[in-house]
Curated annotation (Swiss-Prot):
Specifically methylates the adenine in position 1618 of 23S rRNA. It is an enzyme of class 2 (transferase). Its EC number is 2.1.1.181. The keyword Transport does not apply. One of its GO terms (molecular function) is 23S rRNA (adenine(1618)-N(6))-methyltransferase activity. It comes from Cronobacter sakazakii (strain ATCC BAA-894) (Enterobacter sakazakii). InterPro entries: METTL16/RlmF, rRNA_lsu_MeTfrase_F, SAM-dependent_MTases_sf. Keywords: Cytoplasm, Methyltransferase, rRNA processing, S-adenosyl-L-methionine, Transferase. GO terms for cellular component: cytoplasm. It comes from the Bacteria. CDD domains: AdoMet_MTases. This is Ribosomal RNA large subunit methyltransferase F. The gene is rlmF. The keyword Lipid metabolism does not apply.
Length: 309
């Protein structure tokens, strides 16, 4: 088996896509499969409908999600990379749980999106319970439709709309709630122009015309915010301090490694007791997430004994 370099050992996507098996799970994919120049089956990754149908097939084949769709223009996430975040998060929780992967974790997904991808993967792989949040009504409606269309998911995944676009945890984490972890794929760009420039680069890399549609889509709240990635995560760090005793691990993806020093400084100023960086890779693409806790070692161990075992 040709393993994709860098993926987590438990990631289900190490080998090349088996298009025969995927098409059996999702017959609609067959219309998009074509031979590559080397004669291997593939799809046109510049075709948004082909990419979306591939995701439908991957979710059906590997994660038991029989009904999945997103509205046009919303982010269509690469499933292997999203799964990696979940698996590395499981390892982080296991480190404080005697090495045992937790089956009882409760996770808060900031920016669940129309695709609901992290809850779908995390619930299937580990049986975790999720609360997904988003500022977009349309994203919440789409995620809710996915949950309702797949039996059993409504017992494991609940959704909350963030009614204050400038807030992250405020208004979402209730007074008597606790979460074992939060996760987030934050907006990367700091303006609409920067987001469009990024999409233009993506189109050039795919050999697309300048006026062609986006490959993976993305709404404003998914792609950019004032202050960009650093601004968003810095606010997240500041708000996390308000919920220091209600969350074991706060985590977020960090797309740009150069942003880490600023974020570490913000974490120090916020009084984070423990900060961890988890490196991830998918082929040539490098990524990472940072995690922080306001609980000391003894408090984290007690938390795990009470909630994760």
């Amino acid at each position: 088996m040709n393993r994709k370099p860098g993926l987590h050992p438990r990631n289900r996507h190490h080998s090349r896509y088996d298009f025969d098996a995927l098409t059996e799970s999702c017959p609609a994919l067959g219309a998009f499969v074509r031979p590559s120049p080397a004669g291997e089956p593939t799809i046109d990754f510049a075709d948004p409908q082909a990419v979306k149908t591939l995701n439908q097939a991957l979710l059906a084949h590997f994660y038991g999600v029989r009904e999945w769709d997103i509205p046009d223009g919303f982010l269509c996430p690469p499933v292997p990379g999203r799964a990696d975040y979940i698996h590395h998060l499981a390892d982080l929780l296991a480190e404080g749980n005697g090495g045992a992967l937790p089956a009882q974790a409760s996770v808060l997904d900031i920016g669940v999106g129309a695709n609901c991808i992290y809850p779908l993967i995390g619930q299937h792989e580990y049986g975790w319970r999720f609360t997904g949040t988003d500022t977009s009504d349309e994203a919440i409606r789409s995620a809710s439709a996915i949950i309702d269309a797949n039996p059993g998911l409504n017992r494991a995944i609940r959704l909350r709309r963030q009614k204050s676009p400038g807030a992250i945890f405020n208004g979402i984490i209730h007074k008597n709630e606790s979460y074992d972890a939060t996760l987030c794929n934050p907006p990367f760009h700091d303006s609409a122009d920067a987001a469009e420039a990024g999409n233009a680069r993506k189109r050039r890399n795919l050999g697309l015309a300048a006026d062609s549609g986006l490959n993976f889509g993305g709404q404003q709240q998914e792609l950019w915010c004032e202050g960009g990635e650093v601004g968003f995560i810095t606010q997240m760090i500041a708000e996390s301090k308000l919920f220091a005793r209600q969350v074991l691990w706060f985590t977020t993806l960090v797309s740009k490694g150069d942003n880490l020093p600023l974020l570490y400084r913000a974490l120090e100023q916020a009084g984070a007791v423990k900060v961890v960086k988890k490196e991830m890779a998918q082929g040539q693409k490098q990524s990472r997430f940072i995690a922080w806790s306001f609980l000391d070692t003894a408090q984290r161990e007690r938390w795990a004994q009470n909630r994760l075992r």
